[in-house]
Amino acid sequence: SELLTPLVNGLAPHVDLWLAETQSSIAEARAIHAGLPKDGKPFWLSFTLKDEDTDEVPRLRSGEPVADAAEAAAQLGVQVLLFNCSQPEVIGAAIDAARATFERLGAAIQIGAYANAFPPQPKEATANDGLDPLRDDLDPPGYLHWAADWQARGASHLGGCCGIGPEHIAV
């Protein structure tokens, strides 16, 4: 709240919607939501996913199941739930889990995705400890393959995160 309040107060007169981006846990999303003004502006929420050691259940970086995150998003009144800054390979299952949760709840929440182009990060990696290479297979046609899959699974908002540029979006 000490860090969030001045940011929100400064941005409030200038934004059309609120986006809590690259959240790694449900608690983070709830904390951001609690710090937003009750101004009627749409609230979009984007989670980052666990890329490594995945089991059959898509998970946030915190280890929480995406289905639980989707249920929390519905409770928070989110208009769009997105998945970003993750490997494209894990996003499809997250979309499926979110869509199934929203259908079960009868929630009309849109879904979106925007992956990054970095190779998988080791568990011991730290933020900003160097430059990451970009994956060769995620050139514009390679990224289009993933975006088409996400759209087929029900994503209506598509974009790109780190390493995905305008040339990717143009295709």
Question: What are the residue ranges of the model-derived segments?
Answer:
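Domain-level signal for soluble alpha/beta catalytic cores
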Residues: 1-171
